[in-house]
Amino acid sequence: MKLNLVQIFFMLLMLLLGLGMGLGLGLHMATAVLEESDQPLNEFWSSDSQDKAEATEEGDGTQTTETLVLSNKEVVQPGWPEDPILGEDEVGGNKMLRASALFQSNKDYLRLDQTDRECNDMMAHKMKEPSQSCIAQYAFIHEDLNTVKAVCNSPVIACELKGGKCHKSSRPFDLTLCELSQPDQVTPNCNYLTSVIKKHIIITCNDMKRQLPTGQ
């Protein structure tokens, strides 16, 4: 039996109407699932999108919670200073990178030249005598001297440095952290890893005539 044009047109029209109703019903059901379910919306995301969101949130948290504590509680005496100690500690719920560093002068850690941040170059002037143990870790603060001194005008906070009274910077400071690439190296063959970071600093401000605060 042959179909005329009218019958063919009618069948196509019915087919299109059926598809339209099916799509509408499907969208309605999908909406109902989202409205009635307690399932978090992020479970409907693609795994890639969810991973990116979590990574961003974790990254933001890291930038705001980590703090570097540098202690210069002792004035450097002639000769090679003892190696600083660097480790991680959990204080007040925040991960804090703790360091102890000795400074021979303001210029030792207040370096304003942002173009040269390579630790091997910055640490070279500390290798005064051959066959001496390399300094294990050292931190350089790339801020104006007055900016660092101004931290001492901030409210006193409790800390575990000598005296138990410290001051925290109101903003992250630009720092270069130098860490020996391998233990038991001796001068002049000291090789350092360079980490350019921004962290709040916590400092002690005792005897400002002889020492400058360092920080968290």
From Swiss-Prot:
**InterPro entries for this protein:** RNaseA, RNaseA-like_dom_sf, RNaseA_domain
Task: Using the record, list the residue span of the signal peptide; answer none if the entry has no such feature.
Answer: 1-26
Places the protein is found: Secreted
For the keyword Secreted, the answer is yes
- State one molecular function term (GO): nucleic acid binding
Query: Which keywords are on file for this protein?
Result: Cell adhesion, Fertilization, Glycoprotein, Secreted, Signal
Q: What is its main location?
A: secreted
Q: What is this protein called?
A: Inactive ribonuclease-like protein 10
Source species? Homo sapiens
Gene that encodes it: RNASE10
